Structures are given as C-alpha cells and as structure tokens.
C-alpha cells in the first residue's frame, strides 16, 4: 500500500489547461502535482529534475510535441504517461500512435462547444493516474507488430461476406487499459479463414472506437469493424462495441446478430464486458470462449463466471503480460475462469478452440 502521494508532472501548452488539471488533481490527497511544463523539451528537463511518478501529456504542443517527448520518455525509463487527448478524429489517430509508443493510457478531453467540461472526466483522470502510479513497473514485453510490414504483406484473400459461414466459436473479449496494443498483437496473428467470430468490449470513449477499428482492420487478415446493430456473427469477423453503447447478441432464424443499446452503465461502464459476457453465455453457452484481459477495475469479472457455468471456456490474461492486472485478477480470485494464459499464447488458443464443429444458427 502506497503511503506517499503520487507525484505528477503536467505537460500542456495551454496555461489554462495546466491550471485546470493541476487544480483538479490536487483535490485528491493521494496526488501531488510537483510541476508543470508548456512543451516537450521543457517537460523532459522537468522529468530529469523532479523525477515524477506519472506524467500527464498533451500531444499537440509547439517546439517539441507530445509524441516526440513520449519517444524520449520511453527510451529513458519507465515513467508512466497518461495522454490527455483531444476528442477529435485527429486526436484519436494520434492517441493510438502514442499508445503504441508506450503511453500507459489516455483520457479524452471534452470537445470545445460541448456541454461537458474537464471536471466531467476528473474521476477518470485521477483513477488512471492512481493505477499508473501503483504500477511503476516495466511494461510487459510482447512480440511487437510492425504495422507497415503487416499492411504490405500478402495476406490470404478474405472470403466475401456472402460466402462466409456461421462461426465455430463465439469469442467474447473484455479489455481496458493496455487493450489497444494487446488486441493489435492478438488479432493480427489470426488468419483470414479464422473460423470463429470475435466480439470485443474495449473501454474507450465514443468516437475513438471507430478510429481504433479502422487501425486494426489495416493490420489484420480477418475483418475488423465497429459493430452496428444487426451485424451478423460470421467466421473471420471481429466486431468492436462502439463507445458509450452496450453490446449483446441475439439468435435469429436468418443469422445471429449483435444488438446495441443505450441502457445505463453497468458498474460504471458503457460498454460493459459484464453485459456482453452474460448475453453470450445465455445465447451460446458451451460454444463461447470468453477472455478477460488487461485493465483496471472489475468489469467482466463476475459475468465471465456465467460463461464458465454455461459450459464455455473462461480465460484470464496472466499478470506478467497485463499492463494492469485488475479485471483478470478479480475474475481469478472469484474462481470465475478455467485458465490463465499469457498474451503471447492467446492467438494459438483462439485458433485451436475455433477449429471445431461450426455453430448452427438453429441448434
């Protein structure tokens, strides 16, 4: 248990934003803002001088921008960085680049003209700083994925949608902090003729999931898209739940589909892995493989037990390969999983589990 405050450096080119973030963080006695910086170059000097536990970082700054500063930070050591990102398409694009470079996590600033203010995301920023400050360990080492190489590689042609069959397995994934890189690694290993369908709840703001889906699609042989109500569960397809929606499945005579809803958050989350896991357990039972992966909190830790109880396979990512061992740890402690597996082994597990008799929409 930490007994001293988490020492935070705030880096942002806006004097107003630096002041607002500082005032917001200092309301929590577990956090101490030890300094601020207006650009990346000054921020690096402050890191050397003050040795913060966590850095909050704006990406769009003059002189040295946040991306360049992040490159230097990841080369120099293990100081966790929380990106405070613009809630725009360009902001989402840059945020995912930052996560690949080694940022610990991100928070989306409300858009100008929005009714939301920075105070609306205060709890999220504070929670992520606390998790990052507690982690303070080397990020798990996983095999890196060269996106450019993946895009240029000759992949097997993806079967057209009309010719694809019902899937052999329904794979449901709940994931949070550390998820973008883990999903890129895992999904990019799957072949175009992968026999399962994949449903993903990644804790991410509305608007960011579309950009995230597009980035994954560029690097994967399987189809990856942001889910829409009525999307069919097809072999070789991964559907990512949109931010601020819940995702369930429904069995239909003409093909099984996903259904999105605007129901209230569950355990503080929308989308919620608990909602997805309960739905797939009810509809598909033993034909489900559920993964609870890296992330803070306990979303999905209870409902993955419903998959296990229904005869499906419930899998938790192990501590060594998790950026934050929160969600999987709680699921393990509650006895709700069958296996604990490292990230490097998950692609093979999915391929082996999916190499089975295909699901019929009528059984």
UniProtKB/Swiss-Prot annotation:
Tell me where in or outside the cell this protein is found. Answer: Cytoplasm
What the entry says about post-translational processing?
A: Phosphorylated by CheA. Phosphorylation of the N-terminal regulatory domain activates the methylesterase activity.
**GO biological process, alphabetically ordered:** chemotaxis
Coiled coil feature spans: none
Keyword entries, A-Z: Chemotaxis, Cytoplasm, Hydrolase, Phosphoprotein
The molecular function terms of the Gene Ontology recorded here are: phosphorelay response regulator activity; protein-glutamate methylesterase activity; protein-glutamine glutaminase activity
Q: Which residues carry this modification: 4-aspartylphosphate?
A: 58
Active-site residues, as the UniProt record annotates them:
176, 203, 299
Enzyme class, UniProt record, top EC level: hydrolase
Domain CheB-type methylesterase stretches: 160-357
Q: Please give the CDD domains that the UniProt record associates with this protein.
A: CheB_Rec, REC_CheB-like
Respond yes or no to whether keyword Transport is given for this record: no
Q: What is its EC number?
A: 3.1.1.61, 3.5.1.44
InterPro entries hit by this protein: CheB-like, CheB_C, CheY-like_superfamily, Sig_transdc_resp-reg_Me-estase, Sig_transdc_resp-reg_receiver
As its record notes, the protein acts as a catalyst of: [protein]-L-glutamate 5-O-methyl ester + H2O = L-glutamyl-[protein] + methanol + H(+); L-glutaminyl-[protein] + H2O = L-glutamyl-[protein] + NH4(+)
Q: Which residues form the Response regulatory domain?
A: 7-124
* GO CC, alphabetical: cytoplasm
Q: What is known of its domains?
A: Contains a C-terminal catalytic domain, and an N-terminal region which modulates catalytic activity.
The family classification in the record reads: Belongs to the CheB family.
Give the protein's biological function.
Answer: Involved in chemotaxis. Part of a chemotaxis signal transduction system that modulates chemotaxis in response to various stimuli. Catalyzes the demethylation of specific methylglutamate residues introduced into the chemoreceptors (methyl-accepting chemotaxis proteins or MCP) by CheR. Also mediates the irreversible deamidation of specific glutamine residues to glutamic acid.
Q: What is this protein called?
A: Protein-glutamate methylesterase/protein-glutamine glutaminase 2
């Amino acid at each position: 248990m930490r007994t001293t405050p988490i020492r935070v450096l705030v880096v942002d080119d806006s004097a107003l934003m630096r002041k607002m973030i500082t005032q917001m963080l200092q309301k929590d006695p577990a956090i101490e803002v030890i300094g601020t910086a207006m650009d990346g170059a000054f921020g690096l000097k402050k890191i050397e001088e003050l040795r913060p536990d966590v850095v909050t970082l704006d990406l769009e700054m003059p002189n040295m921008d946040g991306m360049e500063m992040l490159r230097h930070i990841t080369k120099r050591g293990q100081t966790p960085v929380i990106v405070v990102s613009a809630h725009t398409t360009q902001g989402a694009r840059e945020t995912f680049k930052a996560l690949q470079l080694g940022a610990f996590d991100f928070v989306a600033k409300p858009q100008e003209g929005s009714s939301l203010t920075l105070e609306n995301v205060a709890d999220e920023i504070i929670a992520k700083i606390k998790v990052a400050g507690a982690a303070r360990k080397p990020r798990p080492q996983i095999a890196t994925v060269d996106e450019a190489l993946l895009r240029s590689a000759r992949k097997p042609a993806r079967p057209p949608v009309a010719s694809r069959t019902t899937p052999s397995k329904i794979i449901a994934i709940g994931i949070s902090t550390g998820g973008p890189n883990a999903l890129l690694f895992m999904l990019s290993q799957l072949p175009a003729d992968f026999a399962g369908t994949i449903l993903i709840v990644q804790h991410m703001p509305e608007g960011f999931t579309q950009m995230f889906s597009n980035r994954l699609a560029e690097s994967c042989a399987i189809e990856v898209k942001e889910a829409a109500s009525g999307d069919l569960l097809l072999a070789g397809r991964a559907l990512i739940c949109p931010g601020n929606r819940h995702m369930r499945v429904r069995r239909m005579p003409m093909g099984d589909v996903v259904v999105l809803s605007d129901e209230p958050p569950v355990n503080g989350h929308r989308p919620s892995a608990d909602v997805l896991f309960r739905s797939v357990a009810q509809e598909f039972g033993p034909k489900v493989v559920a993964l609870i992966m890296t992330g803070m909190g306990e979303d999905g830790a209870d409902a993955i037990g419903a998959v296990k109880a229904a005869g499906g396979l419930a899998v938790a990512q192990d501590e060594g390969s998790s950026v934050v061992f929160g969600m999987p740890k709680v699921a393990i402690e509650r006895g709700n999983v069958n296996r604990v597996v490292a990230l490097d082994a998950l692609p093979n597990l999915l391929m082996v589990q999916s190499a089975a008799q295909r699901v019929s929409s009528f059984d």
